[in-house]
Each structure stands twice: as C-alpha cells, then as structure tokens.
Swiss-Prot record:
Organism of this sequence: Desulforudis audaxviator (strain MP104C)
Function statement: The heterodimer acts as both an ATP-dependent DNA helicase and an ATP-dependent, dual-direction single-stranded exonuclease. Recognizes the chi site generating a DNA molecule suitable for the initiation of homologous recombination. The AddB subunit has 5' -> 3' nuclease activity but not helicase activity.
Gene Ontology terms describing biological process: double-strand break repair via homologous recombination
Lineage: Bacteria, Bacillati, Bacillota, Clostridia, Thermoanaerobacterales
Record's protein name: ATP-dependent helicase/deoxyribonuclease subunit B
Location of the UvrD-like helicase C-terminal domain: 279-584
Amino acid sequence: MALRFILGRAGTGKTRLCLEEIRKELRQAPDGPPLVFLVPEQATFQTEYALALTPGLSGMFRAQVLSFRRLAWRVFSEVGGAARPHVGDVGKRMMLARILARRRNELRLFGRAAGQYGFSGTLAGVLSELKTYLVTPEALEQAVRMLPGTAETDSLQAKLEDLRLLYTDFERELAGKYIDPDDYLTLLAARLGESPTLRAAEVWVDGFAGFTPQEYAVLEALLKAAARVNVALCLDPRSGRREDLELFQVTRDTRARLAELARKNGVELERPVELAGPPARFRANPALAHLEREFFRRPTKKFAGPPENLRLVAAASRRAEVEGAAREILRLSRERGWRWRDVSLVVRNLADYHELVATVFADYGIPCFIDRKRPVRHHPLVELIRSALETVTENWTYDPVFRYLKTDLVPVSRGDVDLLENYVLAHGIKGAKWADPEDWHYRRSDALNRPVPNGTGAPAPSDRDRYLREKVNRIRRRAARHLLDFQRRVQAAGTVRELTAALYDLLSDLDVPGRIEEWSREAETEGRLEAAREHRQLWDGVVELLDQVVETLGDEALTPEEYGRILDSGMDGLQLALIPPALDQVLVGSLERSRNPDIRAAFVLGVSEGVLPGRHGGTGLFTDREREVLLAAGLEVAPDTRRKVYEEQYLVYIALTRAGHYLWVSYPLADEEGGALAPSSVIPRLRELFPGLREETLALEPEGTAPGADLPYVTAPGRTLGFLVTRLRDWKSGVTVDPVWWSVFNWFAAHAGWRERCAPVLAGLFYENREPRLDPELTPELYGSRLVVSVSRLEEFRGCPFAHFARYALRLKERDVCRLAAPDIGLFFHAALKTFEDRLREAGMEWDALESADCTRLASAVVEELAPQLQSEVLLSSPRLRFLTGKLERVVERTAGVMAAHARHSRFQPVAVEVAFGPGRDVPGPAYPLPGGGSVELAGRIDRVDVAHTDNAAYLRVIDYKAGPRSLALDDVYYGLNLQLLVYLEAGLREAAALAGRECRPAGAFYFRVQNPLLKGGTPVPPAEVAPRLLKAFRLQGLVLDDPALLRLMDDAIGSESAIVPAGLKQDGTVKKKPGVVSAAQLERLQEHVRRVVAETAAEIQAGVVAIAPYRKGQANACRYCAFKPVCAFDPLLESNRYRQLRALTAGELWRLLGLPEEDEPGDE
C-alpha cells in the first residue's frame, strides 16, 4: 500500500506521465495485475481513446479507464451489493413528489412550495448534495440542536427540520427495496476492500482539483486496498510565492487531506514526482508560457513585444463573438492544417452559448460536439405522452388533442391534421363529440346574419361539402382510434401499474419504437449522428422511466391527473448524456466539465464580469450565510466562500492554460436584449501583462471599406453568401464597400452549384415589393361585370388597395374559429335591438312609453331567443360564456332604457330598422357613374332610420349601432377612410319616400354605442344624477346640422350642452361651434366629396389597382390590425414600401380643400 503524488503546473505533462507509466506496464506485462486510471466522468472516453491509440500495444486487458461511478459498478459486479432495483433521478423525483404530497401539511417551511411544479426536483438535488457530503438525517437532527436559538437561525432551523423529515421518509422508502445512485460511492467505500481485482491493482488518479467527502471515502478505501495509488495534482511543487500558494490552494488542500488519510491508515507516502521544469506544453510559445507563469504573480512582469498566438477580442454581441470564433477556427484549420479535434471551445455558462454555437458552427460547416446533458421536453415522444394524458384528463379539449396529433407519431399526415384542425376549430368540437359513433354533421352558419333554416327546407349540402364531411370523418376516426382505446384503459385502471400498462399499450399500438428507430436511421443517413443517438436514448429513457414508475409506485391508487403530474415531473428529469459521436470534432463545453488533453487551440468565450471568475450566491435551498452557520455547527454541506474564491482563481488558470499553441479570449459587449456587459477582471490583467497585445473589436456584420478589410468574413460559402447580400445592399444604398466582395460575387457566379443558390438571394436585392395593376381582362372575372360594393369594402380599399384585393379578389380569410369575438358581439347587439324593436311593434308599444320593467322583460326574452343562434351556440358552450350572456342581457336592457329616454326627449322616432339597400334588397342603393363609363352601386344595411315631422318639413337621420367607442373625424371622411355615415344618410334620403312616406331633409348621421357604462367618480353618484349621467354616456356621435330648431327636435331639453347629440346652444340661441356640427352647405359639400371618392375608388378597383400602399395618419395605420400582412410582406424598411402619409386636417383646412370659406375652429364655447 503506497501513495505517490505527481505534481506540476499546467502543461508540465502530468497526464502524459500517467499514460506513459500505464503503457510501460502494459508493454512489460500485458497479463499482469490490473491498472486503473481514475478520471472524471466526462474525460473517460477521451482518455480511453488516447490509451487505445498507443502504438505497439499487444492488448489493453490490464488497463481500465474508470470514473468513480464506473468503478462502483465494477466493484459491485465482483462483490455484490447492488442487486436491488436502482432508483434514478426520475424515480427519486416521483418518490419525493409522493412524500411531499403526504407530508405537505406537516412541513414548517416547505408546505407551500411542496405543491409547486418542479420542487421535487429541487429537493432531489438537495438530498443528493447531502449524500455527497455524507450528511445523514441524524446529522441534520444534531445540527438543529447545535444551532443557536436566534431570529437569524429560525428559518434555517425550520428548513433543517423539514429536510430531516423528508430525508427520513425517503430513506425509509428505499430501505431494503431500492438503491439510490447517490449512495453508490458510500457503498463502494464500504465494499471496495472486498474486491480481489483492486487488492493488487495500481491506480492513477488524474483530472481532479478536489474531491467530495464521498470521493475521499472511496480514495481512503483504495489506499488501503490497492498496491499503489498515484494522484496527479496541478500545483507548483517548489514555489513558495504567496500568489502561487493561493492559486493552487484547492489542490494543496487536496494533497494535504490525502496525505493525512495515508498516514491515518498506515499507507506509505512515497517521494512525489515533481515536474518542476518549464511546462512542455508551452515550449514553442513564449507568450503562453509567460501567461501561465505570470498571470497571478505580482509585481507584473510584462511581456516584451507583441504576443504571437494570443488574441483578445471584444465582440458586439454573443453571436458576433461565436461567429468570430468560428471564422478563426476555419482559418486555423486551413492555414495550419489542424484537425477539428485539436480545437476546444470553453465557456463558463454553457446555457448562454450552446444554441448559438450549434447554429453558427453548422452554418460554417464546423463539426462540433457540445458536452452537455440534453433536456428532452422538446421531443415529440415526450409531447405525445404528455398530450395523450392531458387529452383524457381534460376531456378532449382542443390544445392537447392537436399537440398529440402533431407529434408525427400518430398515423395521420400533417395535411390531414390541418384539415381536421380547421374543421374542429370552426365548429367548436370537443369532449364527447370525439367519441360519437355517428358521423359529424356540423354546418357552419351564422343564424343572426345569414340564417340557415333547420329541418325541412334547409339547403342541401353541395358535393364539396359532402366530400369534405366524409373526408373529415375518416380522418377523425383514424386520429382518435388509439386515443379512445387509451381513454378506455385509463378509465378502467385502478393502480399506477395499470395506468402505466395503458400508456405502454398506446405507445405499442402507435408503433412508437419503430417510428423512433426510423427517425434514428434517417438522422444517421443525413449525418446527424447526435440526433440519431438522441432518438434511441430517449426511447430507452422513457421505457426506464415507466419501469421506475411501476417499481416505485406500482400498486398505489392514483387518479389519472395525479399520475400525469408525477409522470410529468419524471419526464422533466429525463436528460440525455451523449458521448462524442465522431472522433474529429471541435469539443465545446463548460469550463468545469471539459477535459481536453493535447489540444492545440483553446477558445475561451464569454469572459464577462461576474462570469469568469464567477460571483457566488446561495444555490439550492441554502444561502451562503446558512452554509457558514451550518459549518460552524459541524455540518459541511458545500465549500465555504473562501474556498469558492480559490476555486474561481483556479478555473481562470485552467481556462488560460488549456492549449499549448494558440489562445483566444473574448467577451461580448452586450447581451441579446442590447444590455451592456462589462469585461471580466481577466481582460485588464491580460492587457497589463501584454502591452503589445492588440485588442480586436468584432462586429456582427462586415463594415470595411478599405481593400481586404472584410477578408476575414470570407470563409464558409453559406455564411459568406449572407454577408455578400448585406454588403451589396450597402453598396446599393451608396455606401463604399471593400472590393473583395466583387471577387466573392464572381466566385459564386462561377461555381454552378452555388450559382443556383445565389441567384434568388441576390435577386432579392433588386426586388421591389410592388404589385402591378391587374390585366384589364382579369378584373371583371375577379369582381364581376357589374360593380356592387359595400361601404366597408370601399373603406378597405382606401386604407390599402392590396388588402381589398386579398379579401375580395383572392377571397382570403382567417380560418373560422368558433369563439366569441368583438364582431360577433356587435352582430349580436344589432340583432338584439332589431328583435327588441319588432317585439315592441308586435305589442303595439312605443319607445317613449317604455318602462324599466318592460326593458328588463323584453331584453331577457330577446337574449334568450338569440343566444342559441350565435356561432353554433357558442354562448351556451361554457359556464364563462353563459355568464357573459347575462352581461349581454344587461347591456341590451340598459341600451333599451336609454333609447326610451331619447324617445321621450325627442321628436325623432324610428321609421325603419335594419334597412338593407342595394340590388334586390329592401330599397335601391345609391349608384354613381364612373369616369371611364359604367357605374357603381352601393349596398349596405342601415341600423335605424329616424324621422321627425314639423308643419313645413320632415327631417331624417340615420343611426349606426356600435359595440365599441366610435367617433367621426371629418378628415377621415375626406380621405375616404370613413364613408359609412355619409353614404347611409344619402341612401336614406334617396329612399325617404319609401321609408317615411314623404321626402325628407337631412338632419344628421350618428353612431350609437351599445353599452352598459360604468359611471366613474371619486364619490358615490347621487341617485338624482344617475339618469342624466347615463344619457351623457350614451350621447350620439357624428354629424348634426347647425339648426337650433332642428336640435330642439332632437333634444327638447337642450341647453349649453345636449345629453343626446354632440351639440349645444349659446345664450343667444344660436348653435355652438363643435367638431360634429356642420352647416347645410358644408354637409352638401361633404356629400358631393363622398360621391366623388366613391366613384374614384370604384374606378380604381375596376382598373385593377392592387398596390401595397397602406395609409398612415398619426399613430393610426392600415397594417395595425390587418390579417394579410404575411401575404403582402410589407416592410417599411424597403425603399419600395412606404406608408401613404395622410396629414391630419383642421376643420379650416378641410373646408378650404372642399372649396368653402374657412370658419373659426370649432370649440366648446
């Protein structure tokens, strides 16, 4: 029994010495005693590979490269001790979730967190840490007693008591039945001495700076059992400088502790091997040798001259940083002939970089292996399991059903799934309807607007409707068959074992194993080796998960919801740990995990403040302060703050001394959101050590103008093509660009394979997103030979001609969804008020005689009658929408009450409601001649026409109901963006004889908001003020003539302000100037202008104008709520895409443009 240390600074050859000694033993006695090389888990593959490459070896039977965990399995296979089922991370999470649910009400501190998603995973991590530090439940109990009873420790005491309770329960559930992998090393330490293999073995330990208490226990057992243990440690064996002592404090502590264990157990402490000379790794590179030796030493010894093979880079962003590293790796490969495996890229926070590295390296054609455990939450198999369970527990709601169908693991094509999804959304299908044995026979209808008769007389479905219905029913049966079988099995299951069997049957019925294997083979064929192994590993992981569920919870009775939550927690814990699938790859890893012997170049990225060296706060359940208190109480649960500082220093040292030939150190100046990032203290230290080091700045895109300035960006063809497009766009904008890009352009043009890819990309540079006019012969086919248009259609054209083209020519529309949206509510209110008016007439009642009780009774009857007719009974489809029905009823009731109040104060009375005008409707619509010949006829529906009679004349006004706030801006009328009220007024006046029995004069045109307003105020509203304030809340908005007598017809109580119309009278009885008040001449001029706008707009439609030309007026623009943005691809950054800027007009400017004299601006005189 002997212990020998192999000591040396970074690069002195400690690992090489270990390997050479093992090789020498293998050559001298291939069948001699075992040789064990103990290394960190992540280094086993590379170390084994390095040993296997040794020339001249006749065999490696004696040598074994092992991690602590693999050593445990080797010993257990010899001496036993691990026959019980093993509970992995997933099984532990599920077991702890059950314990938390059982103990939740007894926990002092964790009671609330116990039910939170993911807490069982946090708890599993804490228990793992406790076991790593050999802390037992009894030790926790002892620590509670040792804590001082202060306010500071109350929370810690509660935390420890909860942990002791949960830890005890966990151990009790394991006892005699299962083995926790976190106990492997504890068991190994106890049984290692029984291993016949290790008694005569020689062991080398390399790659560690320190060990956990569990690992120290194993090493102690090894010292007592093995013939000799060699431990390689990175430290300077001869330097007594304070800086060196601090730098290697971690490894010095490790050496001291191991030496103490040797002395304690009577193990001979051999003379150490001291590799004290200059590190061989940096022999050919003086700058890197200087960096290794002097980085932590004071006073600073500066390096003379520019350092070769050392680069310091400040990047605009993390992406620019990774792209710059990728370009440099390509350069090193091409110019120096280095293999990919000669290069390592390390970062401290891999989570910030791994997706960027994977994407960018793929763009540059650099093969890489990212050393991290892959979460599997994204994988279709996990989504299939999760969504299948949710479908059953949530009664077949839309979201889980279609997540299940879109996994590509169900025998339904994506096209069929899309068709089925559209049908289901349009008809609101969910729940038991999926299990209906009869065919689905749903009709998409809107009974409030386009009634479809039920029963006899209903229009027969078209051939297309029948074909679609038959196809949808075939698809839905195929889609739901396995899921319905799964639901029946789940409903019949009583235990976890039966629920798991039901789930496994579903996976088997769908042939998931075969499909996963097929995906894996496809990925291998395409060269995506990591993806291929991911698929296979995940299937094995899921099967193991199901086994653990049954093993740990098999006979427990759980509801499907509880089972789903436990399984969800287990799948969250599933992670894939892959070995490098190829030998020649750039290895990418976090600084703590990566072990790369014999690399030439190291790229250290992300050297930002607080990252390297890192800041430390509490992790897991304990804060740093709590760990210090526990250490004082005799309980070690993690390194203290002082040791962490030393560990950070050591990590910086390791990062900077990885490679012997080339070192790249970089930091980003900003994060993904543009927030500034400061460089680490490492950066100014490098500047101080190397005055001749030129710090480079990397932009994401090339920006050079001088010849050759952008040459570093010319690397991989795929990425270079993107840069070429950027630079040519700059050139097109008048910017001087590096001439190298013309050579790049010529290269792409000369290479056939790239010429085809390059052509459409470069064509985009000169593409103008414009739409030419339609062929004159095509327009009549699209719009018909006779132009009949609605006002909203004209307004849409004025907003953007292309939006009109998309809706009315291409007939594009968003897919139907059975839900209650704002247009549906507006439609409901229109129908409700019309029905209310009909019921009034049937009862022989007038509006002005309507009482509050009448409003309540009629509103209830109307809403009850109409609710089933809206959107396939959408108002009856859920408790929330049934509650909303009650609110809609109160709105109708309140609105009717206000309309009755209007009637009592006004001579205007409704003469017609829901007046449809246009060809074949209630009355003809306005028709206007077009400049090029022909005419346009307008169609629409006026919500209400009111008339007031005097001795001399009759006056007509139109009212349009709105479910939301709406006002009339006269400049919107001028620009054609709001034509509705003026067109409706003209339509009413033209057909006044038919509607009112006589010709009428115009009185006004208004919006009436249907609402149940909340009267706001700092104090309760006095009862006497409620009615007047309600009237004001319902005040009509729009246009009214400036005739005092006419205003009194509309509001017999009008004063300085009307509660009914947007007008008021001065003290002298004349009309106040307000935005909505116009003279008869002004109204006539507005109507003339509207006629002209209608004719011009119709002429442009006939002429085939489809320009992508949305308007912008102030903050408003045509694109804000447009559904066709993905179709037109309007981009204001393109020169060819610009908004039509419409200037807001004052009233004076408006009348001047219409040829009338300017007047004083309206106000609230």
